[in-house]
């Protein structure tokens, strides 16, 4: 559909997914077919990864060669291994502890067949391996998500007119400082412009601020309460916190 309307470049944001299939489902949507050692066609799901013996591109449309795909992600995790997609993010997607190692091994086996070079590429593990799939099956290129968005917004020019930059995060933790959006914005902000973070909560593993050009971080939650109550009070808590910060800056 996009090609029919003349689109030549596509940005694909990858991250925060509920999938961990190495991008095999996406590849099937593009026309790729996967077969086992007996030449039986496999379902394009994560549980098939370790059984793939042959990949067919006969039904893949040729127009894919004429489209530039940029894969936007702000994680640097490789596809497999201790820092890979499955070991780091598999638990939060519902994988049982005893399955992590076998799923990781099956994903590695699949890409040893499909594209061995992807196993060493930073960011390939984003989206449960979706980034690896887009590189391998759609000739995509992994780029910094936050930097690409800031470039599209002409951030570097606009920020020069700012007196203060405020970034946000649902829960700021050590992982947030590894290159997620708030830090990406802070790094692109001139040193003379202060950057403050307003967050839902702050994790115990956060190092002291200033850090990564963020001068201070403020949680909006003011009391211990049930999640439903906390969510219902989000607007009120955010406004109160922002007002208090404004009053402090006005001293």
Set out the residue ranges of the language-model regions.
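N-terminal loops that bind phosphate or other acidic moieties
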Residues: 1-14, 18-251
């Amino acid at each position: 559909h996009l090609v029919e309307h003349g689109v030549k470049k596509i940005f694909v944001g990858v991250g925060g997914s509920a999938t961990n299939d190495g991008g095999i489902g996406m590849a099937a949507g593009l026309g790729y077919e996967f077969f086992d050692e007996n030449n039986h066609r496999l379902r394009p799901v994560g549980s098939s990864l370790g059984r793939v013996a042959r990949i067919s591109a006969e039904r893949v449309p040729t127009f894919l060669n004429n489209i530039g795909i940029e894969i936007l992600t702000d994680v640097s995790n490789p596809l497999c291994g201790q820092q890979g997609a499955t070991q780091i993010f598999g638990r939060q997607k519902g994988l049982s502890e005893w399955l992590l190692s076998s799923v990781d091994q099956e994903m590695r086996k699949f890409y040893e067949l499909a594209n061995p070079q992807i196993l060493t590429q930073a960011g390939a593990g984003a989206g449960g391996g979706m980034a690896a799939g887009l590189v391998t099956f759609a000739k995509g290129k992994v780029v910094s998500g936050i930097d690409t968005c800031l470039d599209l917004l002409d951030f570097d020019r606009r920020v020069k007119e700012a007196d203060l930059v405020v970034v946000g995060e649902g829960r700021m933790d050590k992982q947030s400082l590894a290159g997620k959006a708030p830090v990406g914005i802070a790094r692109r902000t001139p040193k003379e412009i202060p950057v403050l973070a307003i967050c839902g909560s702050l994790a115990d593993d956060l190092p002291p601020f200033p850090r990564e050009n963020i001068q201070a971080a403020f949680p909006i939650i003011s009391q211990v309460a049930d999640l439903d109550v906390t969510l219902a009070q989000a607007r009120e808590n955010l406004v109160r916190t922002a007002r208090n910060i404004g009053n402090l800056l006005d001293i």
